Amino acid sequence: FIFDEGHQLAGKCLDQFTLLSRSPSTRQALRETAQWLIAQHDSLSEFVGQEGLLEELRGVLTDLTQLNDDVAAWGESYLEQHAEQSDEYRFPQGIIPDALREHSGALVNVWRRQLDLAQRLEVALDNRREEAEIQLRDTVDAWLGSVQAMVARAEGQLELWHSYKSAELPDLDEPWARWLKAASRNGEGVVFMASPVLARDLLHEHLWSRAAGVVMTSATLSALGSFDRLRSMTGLPVDALYKRVESPFDAQQGVFAIPDLQSDPGDSEAHTAEIIARLPDLINGDAGVLMLFSSRRQMEAVVTGVSGTLDHEILVQDSLSKSRLLERHRENIDEGRRSLIMGLASFAEGIDLPGDYCDHVVIAKLPFSVPDNPREAAHAELLEALGRNAFMEISVPDAALRLVQASGRLLRTEEDRGRITLMDRRLLTRRYGRAILESLPRYRFDLPAAG
């Protein structure tokens, strides 16, 4: 196997094993399944001769609909009481309240019954399929498809609710994050979610122990000059080999600058105001500019604050599709107009803007993780419970990696030159700053004098 962008492997693995139950869509699926059973009842009963099974299945669907409504109502109430300003709530240490575990236990029992009935119906249909007349085969296949969807849905629901039912005590060996979030902006409906916190055991079971050979490549596999973070996230075998290859591009053709700032990102209002005040002079004369933010709120505030003060057309992430936005940016440069892209984390990797398309990358602040990401918060909580420093073990290495990714948008060919400006003095004032600075490519540095 060869995995490009290998730094994403652990996250993609955890995404794959994340469980969820979205109460509105579950209710809709149950309702549609019940209607399908009613519509197909006579034909199905005549074909498979399972009258009692079909009636029992209809009853189970009714019970599941009620249980789904009950747990959704509980979740809506709990979010309203505990989520404060957010539409999301993570259960500390993954431990589920007693009332929700009771709901979960009831759901496990009835979903298991639905799974058993659906599997029996699937077997009955499959056994009779070969005996069916040719003109009935398409109908039987359609029935099988519907029943197999019921089986798959029940299996997914069972995994989620079993995870909740069993979450009475913290598990430091195989930790899980569990959380709720609103299913819609109006607060109606709840999404119940659960995810493993660590990918290493999953990757060992499903990849490292099975593959004869694996190659992982990425411009950002190492963080802070080592592969420790990668090993921690992925559980790579002890005999894995590591190699850092220098970029073919000359980092000396780029300048990495930190202005002499008066504000700190810890004071978001003052920091945003200083960015707005400095940006016109900062990018004056630059043709193509890419500005990257860690916060959508700050990005939107800066867009509003600099409107009408720049010579550049401002292209904001999500105002157009990503491909169209990049196309518009290139058109601006090709036609002699200045252009400024403002984007979030997804614009910090995988974007190629060589030459004049990007001669200045502006980074609003050090790209630390969003602290309310449930899985990352659960990981930090786990490390703290083990007496370790989550900030230094997770946040700083990840920020260093993301800063390298963001800075890497500047030099895309051997001829490229330009400037990277980080609007964050913490790289110079905090104890972790030197380690992050030393992990950057060998740019020419333009830093304010100490003191």
Report each predicted region and the residues it spans:
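ASCE RecA-like P-loop NTPase motor cores
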Residues: F1-G451
